[in-house]
Every structure is written in C-alpha cells, then in structure tokens.
Amino acid sequence: MIQRNIRQLVQYGLQTGLITEADKIYTTNRLLELFRLDELEECSEEVSMSVDELEAVLAQMMDYAYAQGIMTENSIVYRDLFDTKIMSMLVPRPSEVISEFETRYEKSPMEATDYFYKLSQDTDYIRRYRIKKDQKWVAATKYGNLDITINLSKPEKDPKAIAAAKTAKQSGYPKCLLCMENEGYAGRVNHPARQNHRVIPVVINGSRWGFQYSPYVYYNEHCIVFNSQHIPMKIEHDTFCKLFDFVKQFPHYFVGSNADLPIVGGSILSHDHFQGGHYEFAMARAQVERTFTVKGFEDVEAGIVNWPMSVIRISAADSGRLVALADVILSAWRGYSDEAAFIFAETDGEPHNTITPIARKRGEKFELDLVLRNNITTEEHPLGVYHPHANLHHIKKENIGLIEVMGLAVLPARLKDEMEKLEEAILSGADLRKDELLEKHADWVEEFLPRYPQINKDTLMDIIHTEIGNVFMQVLEDSGVYKRNEEGQAAFDRFIESLNC
C-alpha cells in the first residue's frame, strides 16, 4: 500500500502543479527515504489522485509509518507533525513561490493572491478537509445577515500530547506562531509543524512584513499580514498608514487590526499583525445612519454606522486625509471620558480606550471603519463591561476581536455536541436543569421557545441556529461602548461633538 501511496502523492503533486515532471524522480526518492524504503517497486498500473483523496492517502501513509516505528506516537498532534513532513516533500522552495507570486502580481494582484491561496491549500497548510467540518450558517438580524461558524477545524489535543507539552523543553524559537521563523519549521509537541508553510515578503510603509494565509480560514482568503520583527501590537498613526499601504497593493482585499489592549484585542497581542481577505462582512455592508463633519476635514465623508458596536466610518479619495482624521479621532478617544456613559479613558493609570480599525477600497474611494473599544472591568463584569455579559457566556465567552467585530461569530467547538443534545432534550421534553451539560442553556431556551409555535424535528435546529444568531447580535451590542438606544446614541454624539472642540 505504501508504494501505491507514494505514487499517488507524486501524482497529486503533478496534478496540482506543486511539482513538475522534472521533479518527479527527485520527489519520489525523498518520499522513499522518509519511509525508509530502498526502491520503488515496478508497477504497470496507472495511478491518479484527486484533491478529495488527500486526507485518506495521508492517513494510510501515517498508519504505515506508525506500524513501522517511523512515527513514534499515533495521536492527532503527532500525526499532524508527520503529515506536514510528508507534504513538505512536494512544496516549492520559498524563493520559487516568491518568484511565481511576483510574476503573477505584475499581471494583477488578484492573480497573485489566487495562486498563493491555491498553493496554501494544495500543500495542505490549509487543510481543506478540516475546514469543511466547520459548521456555518447565516443569521438574519436587524443589522443585516451575520455569519455564524462553529470552529471544528482546530483539532482537540489528546491528554497524552497535553502531558508531553507540559514536560517538553520550553523553546523561544520561534517566539510565537506569527514569527517569520515558522516558515519550514518542523514543529514539536507544543508548536505546530510548518514545513509546508510559505510567506510572501511585502514592504508596508517602508518596513519589512510578511503575507500569509490563516491555516483556519474563517472566511474567504483569510490572510495575515505580520511584522518581520516580533514587536507588540500598537494602534497609532503608522497603523493607519500601513493599512492603506496594504490596501493599495492589494485593492481587492480589506485589512484590519485587532485593538492593542487586553480583553478587546485578539489572542496574539505580542506580535504586530493585521488580518484581511477577499470577503465582504456584514459590517462593510451596513450603512451610515447619520453623518457629521470634523472641522478641517470638510473634504472627508464621516458618519456613524448602523451597527451593534460603535463604528465611525470615514471615506475619501485621498487616503492621506483619512490617516490624518483617524489620528485625530484616535487621539481624542484615547483621552476621552464621559462618566454619565461609563466611559473612562483610564483608571489607576491603566488605559482603557482604543480602536479596532478596518480599511478597504470602495470604488474610487478609500474607506476606514474605526470601532471604538474600551476594556474597563467591574465587580459585576470582571471580564469586561464592553464584553459579552455573563448571560451570553453559554454561547460566547471569548474576546471579541476583529473578526467578530465585523460580524462573523467564531464559536467554540463544544457547541456542536451541545446543540445536538439540546435538540434531543427539547424534543423529548427533558428537564434541561437536570442535565449537567445543558443546564447552562436552560434560561435561554425557556426565553425563546414560546416564540415558536411549530417545534418539531424538521424545524428545531433551524430555530436554534436563528437564536444563536440573536445571541451573537447581543454579544456585539454588549461589546459596543455606546448602546443602541436614545441615551447611548446621545452619548455617542457627545464624543463626536468633542472632535470639533
């Protein structure tokens, strides 16, 4: 079987364009070496392999490797390390990938990113077969259609691997998952293998950055743009310059940055990076509901967006004017307090106000969304006042970062099983409060069920999905510093007025 698998994988490389006919013998010999084989057996049978067969062929190869003692452990962590090593035999060198990207970029930026995105999938850096497992649906709300996904593509670590990670030697190389040094890295039990990972160098605002795709692809062409230096996230004047520099180079992509403070920031604050992609989020589709003008920037369109979070949208043909106005708004917000609205710029010397910025090109104009954030905590809300409140934690407890802000819920994998069990329990009339797993959902279910007269096997999961969408809408409303009521919007207007003082 391993002989056939090797032939299949080489054929896969040829079919996807990862290797050429000139690479065929070389690649075959590298795979023979990996599996400790001395020769390729004679075979008259023609082999072929589709993209859909990759998962199964790699699984067979790993089963063989484990049986032969080539792979010492057989859990998901070790299998991921080894199948990445297998795929590395097919992946072009970084210089070849960069050269091909640059050649295509001369024709069009979109052709270049199309090539790189396909490559990132063909190399199995983006595991198509795992991404397919994610549960996705669209939830209609008063703010438009929100995207909901239950993330199932990140494998759960088994107890043995978790224990091994605890006792493994702690390494500072690479410093984090976003560092340049990940390219080609073999990985270890507490750090993923990246031999099949490639990075495109880009110059952003005069400094060296890298461009890659997220292996988890939460939306179409989900890319990460990261500083070549391991330096912390910081929202400042240069951030806006960098965002627009990227958009000018890749005008079909949006790009945004997580905020630079805990709670309201992303999961990696230690390494300066942006996220972007070829996708239109619900927030980008949301309309400006009222406009305003900032003195000295009469040439810039500005307004408040109809969105559950507090978003200022500015637009102009000259990106430099947007950078200048964004700088004014950021500076004003950093130092802004409004006790009546429970907005405090700092407490005990700890800063609370920051911004989540998102840049895009729309037609002939550049556009920048500035989402106002505040990370203050209280005894009542120890995880954050402007963070999902406790009554929503049964669905979403994690930080609300850039992706969620724009209208895509990334929900924990536990919800798949919980929602399936919840469906069974509701249909059978079981007492949710007596079920340890489902008890946390009881108040929620009791609140929404009376609204639906037709509850049956055919309708219930759709109802649950709709209500998860409503919870996510509330999550975003909780995270908004200015609430979507008369009092909250009056407070928002006070901040806008302060820009002209």
Language model regions located:
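Generic structural signal marking isolated hydrophobic packing positions
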Residues: 227, 273-274
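Generic detector of intrinsically disordered, low-complexity, polar/charged segments
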Residues: 262-263, 274, 398, 404
